Amino acid sequence: MAKDDVIVVDGKVIEALPNAMFRVELDNGHVVLCHISGKMRMHYIKILPNDTVKVEITPYSLDKGRITHRYK
């Protein structure tokens, strides 16, 4: 899968789940299950509920995503 295949959207974290998983509500109202990208894990970037984040979603599974950026 090439990097061009991802859909990038913004969303708001509504719930923190075990194993660094998060439930994120996207700007269009959909709720997806997301995990943190490897670079964010390496740099110990903490994500809390009500944070605004950038999410990458593949067209193959629209209900799962990857958090790649946390806005300040």
Curated annotation (Swiss-Prot):
Family in the record: Belongs to the IF-1 family.
Keyword Cytoplasm: yes
InterPro entries: NA-bd_OB-fold, RNA-binding_domain_S1_IF1, S1_domain, TIF_IF1
Function: One of the essential components for the initiation of protein synthesis. Stabilizes the binding of IF-2 and IF-3 on the 30S subunit to which N-formylmethionyl-tRNA(fMet) subsequently binds. Helps modulate mRNA selection, yielding the 30S pre-initiation complex (PIC). Upon addition of the 50S ribosomal subunit IF-1, IF-2 and IF-3 are released leaving the mature 70S translation initiation complex.
Gene: infA
Organism taxonomic ancestry: Bacteria, Pseudomonadati, Campylobacterota, Epsilonproteobacteria, Campylobacterales
Span of domain S1-like: 1-72
Single GO MF descriptor: translation initiation factor activity
CDD domains: S1_IF1
Superkingdom of origin: Bacteria
Keyword set, alphabetical order: Cytoplasm, Initiation factor, Protein biosynthesis, RNA-binding, rRNA-binding
Gene3D superfamilies linked to this entry: Nucleic acid-binding proteins
Originating species: Aliarcobacter butzleri (strain RM4018)
Protein name, UniProt field: Translation initiation factor IF-1
NCBIfam families: infA
Subcellular location: Cytoplasm
